[in-house]
Amino acid sequence: EPPMFDRSDRVRVIGTAHISSFSVAAVKAQIEAFQQDIVAVELCASRHRALTSNRRLDKEGLLKVVKEGKAPLVMLQSLLAAEQRKMGLDEGEQPGAELLAAVKTAEEANLEVALIDRDIQTTLRRAWKRMKFFEKVKILWSLLGDDEDEDAPEVSQLLEDQDLLTSLMEELKTFSPGAGAVLIDERDAYLAGKIAALEKSSDLRILAVVGAGHLKGIEAHLNESTQPQEAELKELEVLP
């Protein structure tokens, strides 16, 4: 079984590995076994569209993104390039496959699907704002310095594989504590707040599917006497 905890007799949170074929099967099995009414998934609308629409961006398009000042996308592209090479993506599943499996399995069973993650643009802009200048330079330099790497993935692949975010979190927190806090700690609080809001809004059974790296943080927030409230969630959605 995947790592998980039961918040109550009607709320279960399971943790997954974003490139694990085992996670895909485990997610499907849990949805079939838990008899939930709502499946909450660690996706925002933007990431869901990216995973389902095969969005592409060629090098000319990437240059346009850079010129428009969308530095967080450059940060993501560069970090994903390094992580993909390190991990090899040899698990046989598309990154984010278990999240899509959760959505698809829920829809096939006519269950409600809730996308509970903060918008990826907000997360990346807040992370970029927290990074020190030399950290930004290092990331941009790595982007420019990968030209001779024959194993480097195409830009189109990188943008399709946005769900490597969870596997990057601990590494990034060491590299840049400020940015790591945004990607890990803030999103732990945000995801917990969204789960708590769903729990309070009805008596329905809820199964939440999140990256395993968020599981302990979410559980800690849900066990606190003062869980993230609506005002705090709104604060976490503010662009810098």
What are these regions (language model features)?
Residues 1-240:
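Compositional signal for N-terminal targeting/processing segments
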